[in-house]
Protein backbone atom coordinates (compact mmCIF):
# COMPACT_ATOMS: atom_id res chain seq x y z
CA UNK A 1 0.00 0.00 0.00
CA UNK A 2 1.23 3.42 -0.93
CA UNK A 3 0.73 6.15 1.68
CA UNK A 4 1.62 9.80 1.85
CA UNK A 5 1.53 9.70 5.67
CA UNK A 6 3.83 6.76 6.32
CA UNK A 7 6.88 6.14 4.17
CA UNK A 8 7.77 2.59 5.16
CA UNK A 9 10.66 2.36 2.69
CA UNK A 10 12.22 5.55 4.03
CA UNK A 11 11.85 4.32 7.62
CA UNK A 12 13.56 1.03 6.77
CA UNK A 13 16.36 2.82 4.92
CA UNK A 14 16.83 5.24 7.84
CA UNK A 15 16.98 2.39 10.36
CA UNK A 16 19.58 0.62 8.24
CA UNK A 17 21.61 3.83 7.97
CA UNK A 18 21.53 4.32 11.74
CA UNK A 19 22.83 0.77 12.30
CA UNK A 20 25.61 1.33 9.80
CA UNK A 21 26.54 4.65 11.45
CA UNK A 22 26.69 2.95 14.87
CA UNK A 23 28.95 0.21 13.53
CA UNK A 24 31.13 2.83 11.87
CA UNK A 25 31.52 4.72 15.14
CA UNK A 26 32.66 1.54 16.92
CA UNK A 27 35.05 0.64 14.12
CA UNK A 28 36.48 4.16 13.94
CA UNK A 29 36.97 4.11 17.73
CA UNK A 30 38.90 0.83 17.43
CA UNK A 31 40.98 2.18 14.57
CA UNK A 32 41.80 5.43 16.39
CA UNK A 33 42.57 3.78 19.78
CA UNK A 34 43.97 0.51 18.51
CA UNK A 35 41.81 -1.34 21.06
CA UNK A 36 38.90 -3.65 20.53
CA UNK A 37 38.25 -3.63 24.30
CA UNK A 38 38.64 -0.03 25.37
CA UNK A 39 36.06 0.11 28.15
CA UNK A 40 34.40 -2.34 30.53
CA UNK A 41 31.24 -2.21 28.39
CA UNK A 42 33.15 -3.71 25.45
CA UNK A 43 34.10 -6.87 27.39
CA UNK A 44 34.02 -6.69 31.18
CA UNK A 45 36.16 -9.79 31.81
CA UNK A 46 38.95 -8.90 29.38
CA UNK A 47 38.91 -5.25 30.43
CA UNK A 48 39.30 -6.25 34.11
CA UNK A 49 42.21 -8.59 33.39
CA UNK A 50 43.95 -6.07 31.14
CA UNK A 51 43.56 -3.24 33.67
CA UNK A 52 45.01 -5.39 36.49
CA UNK A 53 47.95 -6.52 34.39
CA UNK A 54 48.69 -2.95 33.26
CA UNK A 55 48.82 -1.99 36.94
CA UNK A 56 51.23 -4.86 37.64
CA UNK A 57 53.37 -3.79 34.72
CA UNK A 58 53.65 -0.30 36.18
CA UNK A 59 54.86 -1.88 39.44
CA UNK A 60 57.38 -3.99 37.51
CA UNK A 61 58.62 -0.84 35.82
CA UNK A 62 59.28 0.61 39.29
CA UNK A 63 61.06 -2.65 40.20
CA UNK A 64 63.32 -2.22 37.17
CA UNK A 65 64.27 1.26 38.38
CA UNK A 66 64.89 -0.07 41.91
CA UNK A 67 67.04 -2.89 40.52
CA UNK A 68 69.12 -0.33 38.67
CA UNK A 69 69.64 1.62 41.89
CA UNK A 70 70.44 -1.56 43.79
CA UNK A 71 72.90 -2.66 41.12
CA UNK A 72 74.69 0.67 41.44
CA UNK A 73 75.00 0.23 45.23
CA UNK A 74 76.28 -3.33 44.92
CA UNK A 75 78.70 -2.45 42.13
CA UNK A 76 80.07 0.42 44.21
CA UNK A 77 80.62 -1.85 47.22
CA UNK A 78 82.11 -4.55 44.99
CA UNK A 79 84.56 -2.13 43.41
CA UNK A 80 85.67 -0.94 46.85
CA UNK A 81 85.99 -4.47 48.22
CA UNK A 82 87.91 -5.66 45.17
CA UNK A 83 90.34 -2.77 45.58
CA UNK A 84 90.68 -3.51 49.30
CA UNK A 85 91.69 -7.09 48.48
CA UNK A 86 94.57 -5.81 46.37
CA UNK A 87 95.70 -3.39 49.09
CA UNK A 88 95.67 -6.11 51.77
CA UNK A 89 97.70 -8.31 49.43
CA UNK A 90 100.26 -5.51 49.33
CA UNK A 91 100.29 -5.30 53.13
CA UNK A 92 100.90 -9.03 53.37
CA UNK A 93 103.75 -8.72 50.87
CA UNK A 94 105.30 -5.94 52.97
CA UNK A 95 105.12 -8.11 56.09
CA UNK A 96 106.77 -10.98 54.23
CA UNK A 97 109.53 -8.59 53.13
CA UNK A 98 109.96 -7.48 56.74
CA UNK A 99 110.93 -11.02 57.78
CA UNK A 100 114.21 -10.65 55.88
CA UNK A 101 117.17 -9.93 58.16
CA UNK A 102 118.65 -6.47 57.85
CA UNK A 103 115.65 -4.73 56.28
CA UNK A 104 114.56 -1.34 57.57
CA UNK A 105 111.29 -2.15 59.33
CA UNK A 106 110.58 1.54 59.89
CA UNK A 107 110.58 2.19 56.13
CA UNK A 108 108.36 -0.81 55.53
CA UNK A 109 106.01 0.43 58.25
CA UNK A 110 105.77 3.79 56.46
CA UNK A 111 104.58 1.96 53.34
CA UNK A 112 102.14 -0.09 55.39
CA UNK A 113 100.75 3.11 56.93
CA UNK A 114 100.04 4.50 53.45
CA UNK A 115 98.30 1.26 52.51
CA UNK A 116 96.23 1.40 55.71
CA UNK A 117 95.19 4.96 54.88
CA UNK A 118 94.23 3.78 51.40
CA UNK A 119 91.96 1.16 52.96
CA UNK A 120 90.29 3.85 55.05
CA UNK A 121 89.85 6.01 51.95
CA UNK A 122 88.30 3.11 50.03
CA UNK A 123 85.82 2.36 52.81
CA UNK A 124 84.83 6.03 53.13
CA UNK A 125 84.46 6.69 49.40
CA UNK A 126 82.52 3.53 48.50
CA UNK A 127 79.15 5.23 48.90
CA UNK A 128 76.25 5.55 46.48
CA UNK A 129 73.16 7.63 47.15
CA UNK A 130 74.11 7.85 50.83
CA UNK A 131 74.50 4.08 51.18
CA UNK A 132 77.87 2.74 52.30
CA UNK A 133 78.17 -1.03 52.62
CA UNK A 134 81.87 -1.08 53.53
CA UNK A 135 81.64 0.65 56.89
CA UNK A 136 78.76 0.52 59.34
CA UNK A 137 77.72 0.40 62.97
CA UNK A 138 78.01 -3.31 63.79
CA UNK A 139 76.42 -3.13 67.22
CA UNK A 140 74.00 -5.56 65.57
CA UNK A 141 74.00 -7.03 62.05
CA UNK A 142 72.38 -4.70 59.51
CA UNK A 143 70.40 -6.10 56.59
CA UNK A 144 70.47 -4.11 53.36
CA UNK A 145 67.72 -4.89 50.86
CA UNK A 146 67.37 -4.37 47.13
CA UNK A 147 63.89 -4.60 45.58
CA UNK A 148 63.95 -7.73 43.45
CA UNK A 149 60.44 -8.39 42.17
CA UNK A 150 56.72 -7.63 42.39
CA UNK A 151 54.61 -10.77 42.82
CA UNK A 152 50.87 -11.44 42.63
CA UNK A 153 49.93 -14.92 43.83
CA UNK A 154 47.02 -17.10 42.75
CA UNK A 155 44.73 -15.52 45.35
CA UNK A 156 45.48 -12.01 44.09
CA UNK A 157 47.65 -10.99 47.06
CA UNK A 158 50.60 -8.84 45.99
CA UNK A 159 54.01 -8.61 47.64
CA UNK A 160 57.45 -7.13 46.99
CA UNK A 161 60.39 -9.54 47.15
CA UNK A 162 63.87 -8.29 48.05
CA UNK A 163 67.47 -9.39 47.62
CA UNK A 164 69.17 -9.11 51.01
CA UNK A 165 72.79 -8.55 52.03
CA UNK A 166 73.84 -8.64 55.67
CA UNK A 167 76.42 -6.17 56.97
CA UNK A 168 78.34 -7.88 59.76
CA UNK A 169 81.89 -8.59 60.87
CA UNK A 170 82.48 -10.80 57.83
CA UNK A 171 81.31 -8.32 55.19
CA UNK A 172 82.20 -4.80 56.41
CA UNK A 173 85.71 -3.35 56.30
CA UNK A 174 85.39 -1.06 59.31
CA UNK A 175 83.04 -0.96 62.30
CA UNK A 176 82.21 2.71 62.93
CA UNK A 177 81.40 2.07 66.59
CA UNK A 178 83.45 -0.92 67.78
CA UNK A 179 86.18 -3.08 66.32
CA UNK A 180 84.25 -5.82 64.59
CA UNK A 181 84.97 -5.08 60.92
CA UNK A 182 87.27 -7.19 58.76
CA UNK A 183 90.07 -4.64 58.96
CA UNK A 184 89.70 -3.45 62.55
CA UNK A 185 88.91 -6.65 64.43
CA UNK A 186 91.62 -8.70 66.12
CA UNK A 187 92.52 -11.99 64.49
CA UNK A 188 93.71 -14.43 67.15
CA UNK A 189 96.52 -16.55 65.74
CA UNK A 190 97.70 -18.08 69.01
CA UNK A 191 99.50 -21.39 69.11
CA UNK A 192 97.79 -24.41 70.66
CA UNK A 193 100.30 -24.38 73.51
CA UNK A 194 102.80 -21.95 75.03
CA UNK A 195 105.89 -22.55 77.17
CA UNK A 196 106.10 -20.18 80.15
CA UNK A 197 108.58 -19.52 82.93
CA UNK A 198 106.73 -20.35 86.13
CA UNK A 199 107.87 -19.15 89.55
CA UNK A 200 106.68 -21.68 92.13
CA UNK A 201 107.77 -20.86 95.67
CA UNK A 202 110.75 -18.94 94.34
CA UNK A 203 111.84 -21.81 92.05
CA UNK A 204 111.66 -20.94 88.35
CA UNK A 205 110.78 -23.73 85.94
CA UNK A 206 109.33 -24.03 82.48
CA UNK A 207 105.84 -25.39 81.88
CA UNK A 208 104.01 -25.95 78.63
CA UNK A 209 100.38 -24.91 79.00
CA UNK A 210 97.36 -24.81 76.71
CA UNK A 211 96.74 -21.54 74.88
CA UNK A 212 93.27 -20.33 73.94
CA UNK A 213 91.83 -17.49 71.90
CA UNK A 214 89.35 -15.16 73.54
CA UNK A 215 86.62 -16.49 71.22
CA UNK A 216 87.35 -20.05 72.35
CA UNK A 217 86.92 -19.09 75.98
CA UNK A 218 83.70 -17.20 75.39
CA UNK A 219 82.32 -20.23 73.54
CA UNK A 220 83.29 -22.31 76.58
CA UNK A 221 81.28 -20.07 78.88
CA UNK A 222 84.12 -18.02 80.38
CA UNK A 223 83.25 -14.90 82.34
CA UNK A 224 86.19 -12.49 82.28
CA UNK A 225 87.05 -10.45 85.35
CA UNK A 226 90.13 -8.34 84.80
CA UNK A 227 93.05 -10.49 83.64
CA UNK A 228 91.73 -13.81 84.90
CA UNK A 229 88.79 -16.02 84.02
CA UNK A 230 87.18 -19.37 84.71
CA UNK A 231 85.75 -21.61 82.00
CA UNK A 232 84.72 -25.24 82.19
CA UNK A 233 86.34 -25.66 85.62
CA UNK A 234 89.77 -24.61 84.31
CA UNK A 235 91.56 -21.41 85.32
CA UNK A 236 93.04 -19.10 82.70
CA UNK A 237 95.30 -16.06 82.77
CA UNK A 238 96.12 -13.54 80.07
CA UNK A 239 99.73 -13.30 78.88
CA UNK A 240 100.55 -10.75 76.18
CA UNK A 241 97.04 -10.88 74.77
CA UNK A 242 96.73 -14.68 74.80
CA UNK A 243 94.75 -16.61 77.39
CA UNK A 244 96.67 -19.60 78.80
CA UNK A 245 95.82 -22.26 81.34
CA UNK A 246 97.20 -21.50 84.82
CA UNK A 247 99.25 -24.43 86.13
CA UNK A 248 101.00 -23.55 89.37
CA UNK A 249 100.36 -21.86 92.70
CA UNK A 250 102.84 -19.41 94.10
CA UNK A 251 103.30 -17.06 96.98
CA UNK A 252 106.17 -15.29 95.24
CA UNK A 253 105.92 -11.51 94.89
CA UNK A 254 105.74 -9.63 91.59
CA UNK A 255 102.95 -11.58 90.03
CA UNK A 256 101.28 -9.59 87.29
CA UNK A 257 98.30 -11.77 86.49
CA UNK A 258 96.35 -14.44 88.31
CA UNK A 259 93.33 -16.71 87.99
CA UNK A 260 91.21 -17.85 90.89
CA UNK A 261 89.89 -21.35 91.50
CA UNK A 262 86.28 -20.16 91.22
CA UNK A 263 84.75 -17.16 89.52
CA UNK A 264 83.61 -15.75 92.85
CA UNK A 265 86.76 -16.43 94.91
CA UNK A 266 89.10 -13.51 95.63
CA UNK A 267 92.74 -13.47 94.54
CA UNK A 268 94.90 -14.70 97.45
CA UNK A 269 98.39 -16.06 97.93
CA UNK A 270 96.95 -19.56 97.48
CA UNK A 271 95.39 -18.75 94.11
CA UNK A 272 96.63 -20.39 90.96
CA UNK A 273 99.02 -17.99 89.32
CA UNK A 274 101.55 -17.48 86.57
CA UNK A 275 104.56 -15.24 87.07
CA UNK A 276 105.06 -13.20 83.89
CA UNK A 277 107.77 -10.87 85.14
CA UNK A 278 110.45 -12.82 83.26
CA UNK A 279 108.32 -13.31 80.17
CA UNK A 280 107.59 -16.57 78.43
CA UNK A 281 110.37 -18.87 77.35
CA UNK A 282 108.71 -19.23 73.95
CA UNK A 283 107.21 -16.22 72.20
CA UNK A 284 103.48 -15.73 72.50
CA UNK A 285 101.94 -14.48 69.23
CA UNK A 286 100.35 -11.09 69.78
CA UNK A 287 96.94 -10.84 68.10
CA UNK A 288 96.59 -7.70 65.98
CA UNK A 289 94.15 -6.14 63.54
CA UNK A 290 95.22 -4.85 60.14
CA UNK A 291 94.27 -1.36 61.29
CA UNK A 292 96.78 -1.60 64.17
CA UNK A 293 99.71 -3.30 62.43
CA UNK A 294 102.96 -1.68 63.55
CA UNK A 295 106.10 -3.74 62.96
CA UNK A 296 108.19 -1.10 64.72
CA UNK A 297 106.50 -2.37 67.89
CA UNK A 298 108.79 -4.96 69.49
CA UNK A 299 106.01 -7.43 70.27
CA UNK A 300 104.71 -7.37 66.71
CA UNK A 301 108.17 -7.34 65.13
CA UNK A 302 109.03 -10.48 67.07
CA UNK A 303 105.93 -12.24 65.78
CA UNK A 304 105.81 -11.40 62.07
CA UNK A 305 104.71 -14.93 61.19
CA UNK A 306 101.68 -14.51 63.42
CA UNK A 307 100.92 -11.12 61.88
CA UNK A 308 101.16 -12.59 58.39
CA UNK A 309 98.73 -15.34 59.39
CA UNK A 310 96.37 -12.74 60.80
CA UNK A 311 96.52 -10.68 57.60
CA UNK A 312 95.95 -13.86 55.59
CA UNK A 313 92.81 -14.60 57.62
CA UNK A 314 91.57 -11.06 56.97
CA UNK A 315 92.35 -11.50 53.28
CA UNK A 316 90.28 -14.69 53.19
CA UNK A 317 87.37 -12.81 54.78
CA UNK A 318 87.76 -10.02 52.21
CA UNK A 319 87.78 -12.46 49.31
CA UNK A 320 84.70 -14.19 50.71
CA UNK A 321 82.85 -10.86 51.10
CA UNK A 322 83.88 -9.78 47.59
CA UNK A 323 82.61 -13.08 46.24
CA UNK A 324 79.26 -12.57 47.98
CA UNK A 325 78.90 -9.09 46.47
CA UNK A 326 79.80 -10.47 43.05
CA UNK A 327 77.12 -13.14 43.38
CA UNK A 328 74.51 -10.55 44.33
CA UNK A 329 75.57 -8.35 41.41
CA UNK A 330 75.14 -11.31 39.06
CA UNK A 331 71.71 -12.10 40.53
CA UNK A 332 70.56 -8.50 40.17
CA UNK A 333 71.68 -8.51 36.53
CA UNK A 334 69.75 -11.72 35.90
CA UNK A 335 66.70 -10.28 37.67
CA UNK A 336 66.86 -7.11 35.58
CA UNK A 337 66.87 -9.18 32.41
CA UNK A 338 64.01 -11.35 33.70
CA UNK A 339 61.86 -8.37 34.71
CA UNK A 340 62.42 -6.83 31.28
CA UNK A 341 61.28 -10.02 29.55
CA UNK A 342 58.38 -10.43 31.98
CA UNK A 343 57.19 -6.89 31.24
CA UNK A 344 57.29 -7.61 27.51
CA UNK A 345 55.39 -10.87 28.01
CA UNK A 346 52.67 -9.15 30.03
CA UNK A 347 52.36 -6.43 27.38
CA UNK A 348 52.03 -9.12 24.74
CA UNK A 349 49.38 -10.95 26.76
CA UNK A 350 47.38 -7.77 27.28
CA UNK A 351 47.58 -7.10 23.55
CA UNK A 352 46.10 -10.48 22.72
CA UNK A 353 43.15 -9.72 24.97
CA UNK A 354 42.25 -6.16 24.02
CA UNK A 355 44.17 -4.99 20.94
CA UNK A 356 42.29 -4.50 17.68
CA UNK A 357 43.34 -6.27 14.48
CA UNK A 358 44.04 -3.19 12.37
CA UNK A 359 43.86 -5.08 9.06
CA UNK A 360 40.47 -6.45 9.98
CA UNK A 361 39.20 -3.13 11.31
CA UNK A 362 40.43 -1.26 8.24
CA UNK A 363 38.64 -3.71 5.93
CA UNK A 364 35.48 -3.46 8.02
CA UNK A 365 35.62 0.34 7.92
CA UNK A 366 35.86 0.34 4.12
CA UNK A 367 32.89 -2.03 3.89
CA UNK A 368 30.83 0.10 6.27
CA UNK A 369 31.63 3.25 4.31
CA UNK A 370 30.32 1.53 1.17
CA UNK A 371 27.22 0.34 3.02
CA UNK A 372 26.69 3.88 4.31
CA UNK A 373 26.76 5.32 0.81
CA UNK A 374 24.29 2.69 -0.41
CA UNK A 375 22.02 3.31 2.57
CA UNK A 376 22.04 7.04 1.86
CA UNK A 377 21.11 6.39 -1.78
CA UNK A 378 18.38 3.97 -0.66
CA UNK A 379 16.99 6.60 1.70
CA UNK A 380 17.09 9.17 -1.07
CA UNK A 381 15.15 6.84 -3.39
CA UNK A 382 12.60 6.08 -0.64
CA UNK A 383 12.05 9.80 -0.09
CA UNK A 384 11.11 10.28 -3.77
CA UNK A 385 8.03 8.04 -3.41
CA UNK A 386 5.91 10.97 -2.25
CA UNK A 387 6.91 12.96 -5.34
CA UNK A 388 5.84 10.06 -7.53
CA UNK A 389 2.38 10.12 -5.93
CA UNK A 390 2.08 13.85 -6.66
CA UNK A 391 2.88 13.16 -10.29
CA UNK A 392 -0.26 10.97 -10.46
CA UNK A 393 -2.48 13.88 -9.38
CA UNK A 394 -0.87 16.30 -11.81
CA UNK A 395 -1.90 14.15 -14.75
UniProtKB/Swiss-Prot annotation:
Listed A to Z, the keywords are: Bacterial flagellum, Secreted
Q: Which GO terms describe its molecular function?
A: structural molecule activity
Assigned GO CC terms: bacterial-type flagellum; extracellular region
Highest rank taxon of the organism: Bacteria
Subcellular location as annotated: Secreted; Bacterial flagellum
User: Where does this chain mainly localize?
Assistant: secreted
Establish whether keyword Secreted is in the entry.
yes
Return the similarity comment: Belongs to the bacterial flagellin family.
Q: What does this protein do?
A: Flagellin is the subunit protein which polymerizes to form the filaments of bacterial flagella.
State what protein this is by name.
Answer: Flagellin D
Taxonomically, what lineage is the organism? Bacteria, Pseudomonadati, Pseudomonadota, Alphaproteobacteria, Hyphomicrobiales
